[in-house]
Curated annotation (Swiss-Prot):
The lineage of its organism: Eukaryota, Metazoa, Chordata, Craniata, Vertebrata. One of its GO terms (cellular component) is plasma membrane. This is Vesicle-associated membrane protein 1. PROSITE patterns: SYNAPTOBREVIN, V_SNARE. Involved in the targeting and/or fusion of transport vesicles to their target membrane. InterPro entries: Synaptobrevin-like (IPR001388), Synaptobrevin/VAMP (IPR016444), V_SNARE_CC (IPR042855). Residues 117-118 are vesicular. It comes from Bos taurus (Bovine). The modification Phosphoserine is found at S63. The chain crosses the membrane at residues 97-116. Belongs to the synaptobrevin family. Keywords: Coiled coil, Cytoplasmic vesicle, Membrane, Phosphoprotein, Synapse, Synaptosome, Transmembrane, Transmembrane helix.
Amino acid sequence: MSAPAQPPTEGAEGAAPGGGPPGPPPNMTSNRRLQQTQAQVEEVVDIMRVNVDKVLERDQKLSELDDRADALQAGASQFESSAAKLKRKYWWKNCKMMIMLGAICAIIVVVIVIYFFA
């Protein structure tokens, strides 16, 4: 049988196995990954802050729009009631005018009948 395989020995600390150029020490790699992760977290936090600001701004605009819609609804209701009152007023004026016109026509007919048949 052959001799058991031994793991390659590293010449210097942080040297790559197989005799290649030495890689960064494991502590540096984890620091770099930690920094990248922190940068990503900061980026996400910034994006979330912007999103929260936009949501608050949108909420304020919606609140203002709701207030304006309520005011418009109140104005429309007031307009509707005043228009109904005005319509009724002019309907009665029109009725009075028709009654007066009918009375004048009746008087003219009576005068003509009396004039010709008397």
